[in-house]
Every structure is written in C-alpha cells, then in structure tokens.
Amino acid sequence: MHEIITLQLGQRANYLATHFWNLQESYFTYGEAEETIIDHDVHFRPGIGADGSETYTPRTLIYDLKGAFGSLRKYNALYELSTDADPGQGLWDGKEVIQRQTPIIPSEYQKYLEQGLPAPALSSDTVRYWSDYNRLFYHPRSIVQLNDYELNSKIMPFEDWSVGDDLFGELDKEHDLLDRDLRPFAEECDQLRALQLFTSSDDAWGGFAAKYVDRLRDEFGKKAVWVWAIEGGKKVQKHNQLKRDMNKARSIHSISPQSSLYVPILDPPTRLPISISLDAQSEWQTSALISTAMETVTLPTRLRSYTDFETSLAGEDGTHKIFELQSEILPEDMSNHTQPVQNPEDRRTQASKGGSSKVKREFDLDFSYDDPNNGDSHIFNQVQVGRGYSPEKEVPKSREDLGLKRKERFYNSEPMLESFYIPLAFPILDSSPRNMFSVKHKEAKINVLAALTASSRTATKLKAMEAMAGRVIGVDERENLVNGLGEIRESYETGWMSDSDFDDD
C-alpha cells in the first residue's frame, strides 16, 4: 500500500479539497457492484467509531480559522457518544455561567443527507461554507480550528504572509504541530508515499504553509510533497493586488524548493471557453472547475495498478518542480480525438522532434498563468492524463528503442512526455454545479484531458516577480528574495535559452 496524507490550509483550500473528497467518496462500490479501479486505501483509513462500528475516513488534516467550518462539527455521528447523565460540577460548588456561540444551522443539502434522502440542488446562494456541500464524515483528529484568528475579520485580517509565518511558529512552539496533528496519521501508514498540501499562496496561509512544508521536509526527508497553491484570480484594488503579488513571491520562493511538485492555481482562471458556464464570484463553483483538472491529473496516484507518478514528474533531471495545471473538457464522441494517451499498465515515454512532438501546448483551460502567448514557450516536461475515452492504439516500443529515444531527446533538448489513460470518466455529483459544462454527456459524466507542464513560462513569471520584489519589498528581505527567485528562474531557462544564445554568438 502507498498511502497519501492530505493537509488542507484555509478557506479556499478547503473549498477545493471538499470537492476532491466528494469525488473520492463517489468511487466507492457496494454489494455485488463491479470493483472500482481506485485503491481507496491510498486516501482513506480504517478505524473504530464510538459505538464500536468500523469506520473509513479520509487521511487528512483540515486547518481553518474560527467560524470557517460552518455547521461541520469536530465530533460527528460516527464518533459522538450520547450522555444520559449530568456529569455534575465536580469540586466547584459555585454558580456556573456557560456561554455558547449560536450554532450555524446546517444547509438543506446537509439535512437531506443526514436523513438519507435525495439531496436538493445546490446553488451559489445556498452554499455559505465549504462544509455545506461536504458528503463525508471526518475523524475528529482531522478537524483543527485555529482560534487566534476569525474568518473575514476586519480587525485582525489573516492576509499578510508574515502573519501566517508567525502563527505557525507560535503554535508549533507551544504544541509541536507535526507531533500533535500529523504523526498519528503517519504512524497508521504501511508505506507513506506522499504528503499532499492544499493552500492559498497569496495571503497569510502562504506563510503558514511555508513553515509547515519546511517542517515536513525535516521530518519526512525525501518523501514526496505535492503543493496545490491557490492564487486569487479576481480583480481587486491595486494596493490589495500588490500585497497578493508579494505574498505569492514569498510563497513560491519558500515552498517550491522544498516541494516535489508546486502548482500555482489561478482561482478562477483568466479565460474560459464558451462551453463552460461559471459564476466567478462563487468559490463553490470556481473550485469545482479546478477540481476537474486537479483530481484528474492525480488519478494515476490512486489506481490499484501502481504507477510511478513521481518519476513522470521528475522528467530527465528532476530539476523542475513548478508545474502549470491545464485541462480540456472533451466531447462524448472521441472518434476524432487524436491526442494519444495510454493505459497506466503499459506506460511509455513519447517524444519527437519539432512539429511532430506530441506534447500539447494549447488547452481550453489554463489554471496557472494568465499569459495567452504559450506557443513560443519551451516545454521541458509534460504529464498528461486522459479519462473516460479510448486512446489511439500505438505500436509498442521495445526497451532498447525507449533508451535510444531518451538519449536522443536529451541531446536535442526535446520535451519529455508521459501520458496515461484511465477509462473512468469524471462524475458530475449533486454536490457540484449541475450546468457548468455544456458538453453533452451521459449519466452525468464527462471526458477530461488534464496536464501538468513544466515550461519556460515559469521563468517569465518569476522574472516579473523579481522585478516587483526589487521595487516594493523591504530592504531587510529584498536581497534574499530577489536572489532566491533568480536561482529558481535559472532552472527554467537552462537547456534551451543557453543553446540559443550560443548559436547567436
């Protein structure tokens, strides 16, 4: 077994992660139904409930601020024992004054789920918190409320990167967060494969995540750490955008070198195809759209047939850790689709020269960058995952051919491509927007092609961050941040820009 532990940091991260967990729950099969290709033990852990019954809950830690959990309780129906007797006041014989916050009323969706009835349709107006559309029970240890800050507070906003950095330091000094929160989950694993972290990177959660990842690297050494770094894509006032940009620069500088995979995600993306209907002001809707790509591209990591996803990401030399997230929603009739993808049980590396290269440059949805000029960028490595349709058949290559092709590709600075095919289509759940996709689909399922791409666009992005940091970051931090961003940028230029410069000479 190769388990993955998830960490969810903050409101936006929890919106996305809730869609992710709802999708995992939808893959369960019961009774005599055909066994799914998904290995549920990767993300779920067995346990014992309060009444002695067996439970199966996500391997996850959910961090959020006071007031951010909505109606979700730490102790749910699986772990809460009813008490028949009054425990009394113990040694205290004085008068008790108990103050309780007004509980948040569960959404109609949650009420119907609890009663085992078909849930009503959700809308942007009825979703107030990420817990309003949650379909799972979590272990009490998974729920971690940070009481130092309150959601949407005007007095103490959780916005500055340094605030999150300081908060983690204070909490870790007092409690040792890894020992208190993470270690119980890690000790349950037979063979921990990776730590997956959802976080926003342009606010205080970026600073909190940076400290957390630093501790993870110290504790877990060479274990894979995958970071999904959410960035606000909505337009805000100029001074707020500048603060966001500074936070993003600090996050990518501090987190990406410590990660095995760092994926910046624009929420929502700048451009949308006409086939997608999206309420860009609804976090529920925008995170649902992101989940179609994020959940699809990581699907190989939770199949019963093991796939070496980490090697696919490493590419030729393992130097590229910042990847772009891209996707397309494909029509039900895939007879005209020519993009080859393959079964994980028959993996092959594919690459060729010039225009015949099978890497894909243009996608309908680009979740990482808002630069439309992608045609001139150099692609170092790309991992494609297609689901719900049959790939083109290809002539198998021998191991000798693959070795030769690999050497030729490396010598010619050609991109590396790994592609997977999974027949399991993407399900449209009742916890997701129903009319987001106009593409025709049967049984509320769609075909998706998603990709993680390491390209020279990252160098362009980092160069802009360097320039911004040089102008607005304080003197004490400026040199370290600018130099650090420059060092990261160089790995997204080496191998093709240097060759071009040499030819010019």
Swiss-Prot record:
Species: Aspergillus fumigatus (strain ATCC MYA-4609 / CBS 101355 / FGSC A1100 / Af293)
Location in or out of the cell: Mitochondrion
Region (Disordered), start-end ranges: 330-358
Any one cellular-component term (Gene Ontology): mitochondrion
PANTHER family in alphabetical order: MITOCHONDRIAL DISTRIBUTION REGULATOR MISATO, PROTEIN MISATO HOMOLOG 1
Superkingdom: Eukaryota
Matches recorded under InterPro entries: DML1/Misato, DML1/Misato_tubulin, Misato_II_tubulin-like, Tubulin/FtsZ_GTPase_sf
Name of the protein in its database record: Protein dml1
GO biological process: mitochondrion organization
Keyword line: Mitochondrion
Role according to the record: Involved in the partitioning of the mitochondrial organelle and mitochondrial DNA (mtDNA) inheritance.
Keyword set includes Mitochondrion: yes
Gene giving rise to this polypeptide: dml1
